[in-house]
C-alpha cells in the first residue's frame, strides 16, 4: 500500500505540472506582440516565411509550414479586452501562412491586426518555446537553434545506443533516420523539429536511466519511440 508521503508527492506532481505548464504559457504570452511581429516581418522580407504553407526542402521533400505559422503567431492579434491569462488559455493565432503573412505585412504598414482566431489545445507547448525564441533571435536564429538541438539529440541517442549494444546497432538505427527521412529539412518546419527533438532526447534519456541494464530489447523500445 502506498505511503501517505508518496501519495502526497504524486498528488503534488499531478497538480503542480499542469499549473507549471500554464504558467509557462502565460509568461510566453506576456511578451509584447511587437517583438514577435517585427521578427516575423523581417523573416517575410528576407524570404524566410512565404504565403504558401508548404515548400520543397533541401532533400526534395515537402516542408510543412502550416503548423509553424500557426504556432509562431499564438498570442498575436488577441482581441482587445482579453487579459493575459485568458489569452494564454484560448491561444489566439493568426493562422497558417496564407493568412498570417498578409496579416503581419498589414500590421507593418500601420494597420490593426484582425482575423485572429482561437486555437485552443490542451497545451500549446511549442508556443512556449517559439514565441520567446522568435522574439529574441528571429525566425532564422530559431531555425539554427532547432538544427543544433536536433543534432545534439540525435548524437545523444546514438551514443547511448552505441554504449549499450555497440556501434553497429547505433549505425543501423542512425543511418535510416538521417538518410532516408526528411531529417535535414526539419529546421524548416519548427513544430515538427521540436517534436523530433523531444522524441530523440526522450529515447536517449530512457537509455541513460536504464544504462546499467540496457540491452537489445531496451534499445529496441527506445528506437520504437523514434
Each PLM stretch: what is its role?
Residues 169-174, 205-226:
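Short hydrophobic alpha-helices at membrane interfaces in multi-pass membrane enzymes
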Residues 27-48:
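Alpha-helical transmembrane signal-anchor/signal-peptide segments
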Residues 128-146:
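Juxtamembrane segments of multi-pass membrane glycosylation machinery
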